Amino acid sequence: MNRTACRLMVGVCLSLPGAAFASPPLPTDPRIQTGQLANGVKWVFYENANPPGKLYFMMHVRTGSLNETDEQRGLSHFLEHMAFNGTENFPPGQLIPFFESIGMKFGADLNASTSYDRTNYSLNLPTTQPEQIDKALMTLSDYAFRMLLDEKEIDEERGVILEESRSRKSASQRIREKLWPELFEGSRFAVRVPIGIEEVIAGAPRSEFVKYYRTWYRPENVTVIMAGDTKVQPILPMLEKWFGAYRSEVPAAEPLPAGLKPFDRERAIVVSDPEQTSCSVQLCNVLPGRPSAATVEQFRVELLEELATRLFMRRCDERIKKGEAAFRGAQAGVEDFFREAVMVTAAASGEPGDWNKMLEQLIIELRRACEQGFTDYELDLVKKQTLASAERGVRVEPTISSSSILKTLVASVHDGEPVLSAQQYLDLVREILPGITASEVGETFKGHFDRRTYAYVLTIPEKPGLPVPARDDVLAAARAAWARRLEQTSAQQVAATLPPVNGTGRIVDAVTEEQFGVTSAWLENGIRVHHRYMDYKKDQVLVRINFAGGGIEETADNLGVTSVASLVFTAPATSQLSSTAIRDLRAGVNISVGGGMADDETFSVRLGGSPNDLEFGLHLAHTLMTDGRIEETVFKNWRISTLRSLEKRERDVGAHAADALAELISGGDPRRRTVRKEEVERLTLEQGQAWFERICRQAPAEVAIVGDISWEQVRPLVERYLGTLPTRPRSAGHLDELRTLRRKSGPLVANLTVNTLTPAAVAYAGFIGCEGRHVDDRRALQIAESIISTRLIKRVREELALVYSISASNSAAWIYRDAGLFRAGSKCKPENAELVAQEVHAILRDFAETGPTAEELDNARKQILNRLDVGIREPDYWLGFLEHLDLHGRSLSEITSQRDHYERLTAADVQAAFRKYYVPARMFTVTAVPAEASAVAAGGVGSVTAAASQPE
C-alpha cells in the first residue's frame, strides 16, 4: 500500500505519494537489467555478491484480494497456500521436502505473501548452480501457471487458513472490522481484507479457485525478480523454457479498483472494544490520487512533503518530552493508496480519559504548522539529517544484501517507479535541498492538512466507569479546537555541545588472535574490549558496552527497576542537556546511541552506524554513562504505558501462557515473571536513577566493537571514552550466586483459563534444555530443532490442520543454570489446545525413541550450514559472540569448529543428547484457553494447576 518515491538500494528512500509534472524523468540505476518474454512475462535482474554464491528470487503477481468477487473473498490468499500443495512438477507433498534437501528452510527461504493488489512468492537459493536455478524457475512458473488445485488438498488446507484467521483475532482486528466499512464507505478496500471471510474459506468450491487463478495469474501480470551472485545471461534460456510457453486461455479482465473516494465532509467515528486498553485520536482525510512518481519535479514535491511531516512530528515529540502534551505519542503522514487516493493522517495516543485534550492539542499543533509554518532553525536540522543519510547511502551501497535489493526491486515493479542508485539519489538531494525554504515547507504542509473534510476517529476502551463519548461530542470538540484562538510561538534554538571528556585511559594488555581477526584488550580501569575489523558491510560499525547485572540482581522489593533505569536511553538527557537538546545535537550524525536492559544479566549501551561518526557516538555514550538522567515526563509516560500493557496482557492468552511457562521453569522466581501492577506503581524515578548510576559506575563491563574500522583507529577512541569511566572489577563473579533457579521436578503442567473475548487458545509443550556451555548438546539440539519443526508442520499443521504455524525452538541457557528451553506451540481452537500439546509430546517422544532418519539428519545439517554460511559473514553475528565472550566463558574456537562439528554429528549423537533432556522430570505442558461465558461474566481469570503425570 505504501509507495516509495524513489526506490533506493540503501533503504534511505522517501515513502510518499507522487504526481506527474512536465519535468525531466528520474534516472534509473544502470545496474538493473530488465526484459520481457513474448507472452508478456517480465523479468528484473541485479547482480550482487552479498552474500556470495547465493541467488534470491521473488515472483510478483499483480493481483490480490481487491480482484476477488463476493464468492472468492479470501481465495487470493488461499491460492498462495495452494502453490505449496501440488503443481505439475511437484505433486502434493514433494515441493517442501525437495527444497529442504538442498539446504533451504520453509518459511525462511521458501515463502509467499498476499496483499490487496499483489501476491509475492520468494525463493532463496543456497547456491548459484545451474540445476538449482533451473529448479527454482520451474517452481515459480508452476506457481504462476501450473497449480493442480486438487480438491482433496484444498479441503485439507481449509483448516490451516481458518487457524491463520483465528491467530489474527484481537481487539485491533475487531476495531478494524467496525471502522473500515464506515471510514472508507462504499469502497472495496474496506471489505476485501486478504485473509477473507470464514464462509468462503470453509466452503468455496474448486471452480472458484480455478476461475480466480486463470483470470488473474496470467503472463502480463507476472514479473520474475532476481538478485544475486551470478550473471543473467545463462538464466535467460531457463526463463524462456519455464515461463515463455504459457498463454492465457481466458480473456484479460480489468483489475478492480479499491474504490476509495475523496472525503467531502467532516464527521466523527467512535469505535470501542472491551479489550482495547489504549486510546487514539486520528484525523483522516482522503484526497484525490496521483500517478506514480517518475520525474525530478515530483521528487522535489515528495521531498517537501517528507520534510514537512518530519518537522511536525519533531514538534509533537518536543511537547511530549517537556510534559506539555496530553498524548504519549503522535505522528503524521501522507500515503498513497493504490494510485487511487492519497491518505493524509495525523494521530495521537494516550489515556482514554484525555481523549478531548489529545484531540484539541493535535488540532492546535496542526493549525500552528499550517498557519505559522516552520522556522529556518527547525528546517536546517532536518536538512542536515536528510543529507547525512543520503551521503552515507553511497558508502554502504557496495555491500548491501541481495535480500534488501530484492525488496526494493519488488516495490519498484509494483509501484511502477524508477530505482535510483545511491549516488543518483544523493545528487538529486544535493541539487534540490539547498533551495527548499521553511516557507515552502510550511505551504506544502498546509496544502495537505489545512482541509476541513476530516474523519475524526476515536478508538477507546469499553469498560465500566469510562464513558464512551458520542460522535456529536467528538465532532463538536474538533470544531472547537479549529476555532480556538491560536497563540504565536516559535521554536527555541538551543546552542548546546557535549561536555568535554577530561584525560584518557590506557590499554594495559592487548592480544590479537590472528586466526580470528579478533583483538581482546584490558583497559586499566578494568573494562574488557574485543574488536574485529570487518568490511563485509561498508561504512558500518556496531558497538555493545555491556554491564554485567541488572535484572538478575532485582529482588521482590524492586522488580522492574532495571526497566526504569533503561529510560535514560529512551529520551537521552543529562544534568545539563535536555533530551530535546541532545536530539538536536544528533542532527546530521549517522550513528545511533541507545541502550537499556538487554537481558536479565546485561545492561547494555548500543551504538550502530558510520565509523565516521563513531567518536561522536562514544562521546555521547560516555556523557550518558557518567551523567545520564531520567526525565520526569519520560518516567511518567513509561509508568502509564506499562500499566496499560499489563492491562492488555490480562486478556491475552499468549501472555498468560508465556507467564505460566516462565513460572514453571523458574520455580516461581519473581525475576522471571512479568512485573505486576502494584510493583510498577511503587517504583520511583529516584530508584531507577540510582540503579542506573550504580550499574554504570560499578558493574563489570565487556565491550564488543565490530565493523569497518581498524584497531588502530578505534584504540584511541576506546582509551578516551571508555578508559575514563570509573574503575571496576574485571570479573562478574558476584552474579554466580544469583544464577540458580529452584524449579520443581516435572512433569510440570499449567492449564489456565483466561477472561477474553478472542476465541483462540495457546498450547506449549517441551522440556528444559541444555546450558549454552555444553557445546555438544547445544548443537545436537539445534539439529533436533530443525528436524522436529519439519515433523510438526507435517503432522500438526498439514495432516491435522490444528494450527496455522508451528515450529520447535531450542534456546540454550546462558544466564540461569539448567534453564534451557526446548519448546513448540501455537495458537489454536480452544477445544484443540490439549490435543496440540499431546501431538507435540508425541513427536518429541518418538524422536527420543527413534532419533532422526539419515535423510532428516542430512537435510537439517544442510539447512544449518546454509544459514551459518550467510550468518558468519555478518557483523551482527560476530558482535553477538564477542559481546559476552568473557562473561559466558566462551572460546573463539567455537566459531571455527562449527562446520566440522555439525558435519560429524551422527543420528546416534543427536538422539543421545535429546534423550538426556527429554525425560519426565524436565517436561512441561502449558495451555491457556478462553474462559466459559459464565466465568467471563464473573470476571475470573481461571487458575494454574500443577500435575505430576507423564504427558500423553
PLM region spans:
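Edge/loop elements at the starts and ends of beta-strands within beta-rich repeat scaffolds
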Residues: 355-357, 448-450, 694-697, 917
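Proteolytic maturation boundary segments
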Residues: 21-45, 223, 231-303, 309-317, ...
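Flexible helix-coil linker/hinge segments at domain or subdomain boundaries
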Residues: 150, 248-253, 371-379, 631, ...
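M16 family metallopeptidases and their MPP-like homologs
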Residues: 46-47, 51-78, 93-142, 173-199, ...
